[in-house]
Amino acid sequence: MATTVRSGYSGTPLARKLGIKPGHRVHVHGAPDDYARLLAPLPEGVVFARRAGADVDLVHLFATAREDLAKRLASLRKALRADAALWVSWPQRASKVATTITEDTIRELALPLGYVDIKVCAVDAVWSGLKLVVRKELR
């Protein structure tokens, strides 16, 4: 029997929090070593893509450095479909992981690219996540 890992405080499985649906193509960058365990159980037919591109439904990007995040956001904005979801995760302050990113930093970098944030969640005890989508008028 598969064990369901509950992420954060809600008791909701992480894959559901992130909106991963059956048949989705997902690209993950910089995830912690136990990410596969955190996502379990995955919906049927989920495929992990090596690269972010027009065929990807959801990207989960983990970042600790503002400069790296700025570059990746700009690159992803060009590569992804307008209806793809982009989750950006950063270390929570209480985690003591060195970072130059906060929730406000993500907004500061993403909003000028045409993204808007629509959801926030705890990924695990270290990482928080902010869901970004392209503004409706730009889709």
Regions found by a protein language model. Name each.
Residues 70-82:
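A short glycine-rich, Lys/Arg-flanked "PGG" loop and its adjoining helix->strand segment in the class I
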Residues 1-37:
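N-terminal, charge-rich interaction modules
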Residues 113-139:
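Class I S-adenosyl-L-methionine
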Residues 82-92:
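Conserved beta-strand signature within the Rossmann-like core of class I S-adenosyl-L-methionine
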Residues 38-42:
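Mature catalytic domains of secreted/periplasmic carbohydrate-active enzymes
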Residues 45-56:
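Short acidic low-complexity segments
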